[in-house]
Amino acid sequence: GAPEISEFFKFFVETARSAGARVIDRNNLTIIEEDGFAYLPEYLAEHEVEIIASLPCYSAENVNKQRGNGVFDKSIAALKKLNAVGYGTSLTLHLVYNPLGPTLPGPQQQLEADYKEALQENFGIVFNSLFTITNQPIARFAEDLRKQEKWDWYLDLLANSFNASTVEGLMCRDTISVGYGGEIYDCDFNQMLGMQITNGNQLFLWDISPADLKDRAIQTG
C-alpha cells in the first residue's frame, strides 16, 4: 500500500509533528515516481519524517520478479531523490528486505552490508539500516503456499526456526495498527486477518486511551 495516497496524509503528518510526535512513513518508493507525488521527498524532509522503505533486493531481476516489471528502476530513482534532500545522512532512511517465496531471510547484519555495498557502488545510494522481515503465512502468500503444497512445510520451518529472543521486541507489544475506519488491531498482520481488538465489543481508536491497552492480552491467530 501507499499511505501517501490518502487525502488525510498531510493532515496526519503535520498534526503529529506539531504535537512533537515521531512520524515514520512506511514507503513503497514507487509512489514518489507516480504523477502528483513528486513533492514527497521535499515534503517529508521538511517535516523530518523518518522513512522505512521497501526494497526486496538490490538486483533488478529479483525486485521486478517480486513486485512487477519496472519497479526496481522506479525504486532506485526514488532513493536518489530521497538522498538528494538528506535522507540516508542527516535524515533517517531505513530499507526493508523480505525473501521471495517460502524461505527465511539471511542474517540481517550481512544483508545490510551487501545492500550498502551494492547500492553505493552501482547507484551512489546511501541509507541507514536494513531490516529483514519473515514472510507471514497469511492472505495471498498463504494461498500461494497451499497452491504449491508447501503450507505444512513452511509452518514447520517457522516453528523450527523460532527465536525466543525476538519476543521482547515484537511490534505488537508497543504498537497498534489502525484501519481506515478507526478500527484498532494489535499489529498489521492481525489487521489483514480481521482480528480487531475487542473488550466484548469491537473497539475503535476513539474508544481507548493508552492506559486501556496496558497489560492486555495480545490476540494471536
Q: Which role does the model predict for each range below?
A:
Residues 183-184:
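Hydrophobic "anchor" residues
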Residues 178-179:
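Short, acidic, Ser/Thr-enriched surface-loop or helix-capping motifs
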Residues 154-170:
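Short, basic/aromatic recognition patches
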Residues 12-22, 103-120, 153-155:
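Short, electropositive alpha-helical surface patch
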Residues 126-158, 189-221:
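C-terminal accessory region of radical SAM enzymes
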Residues 38-54, 114-130:
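Structural recognition of alpha->loop->beta junctions
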Residues 35, 61-66, 92-108, 123-148:
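Flexible glycine/acidic-rich beta-alpha junction loops that bind and position SAM and/or redox cofactors
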Residues 1-5, 16-36, 43-79, 94-96:
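Core AdoMet radical
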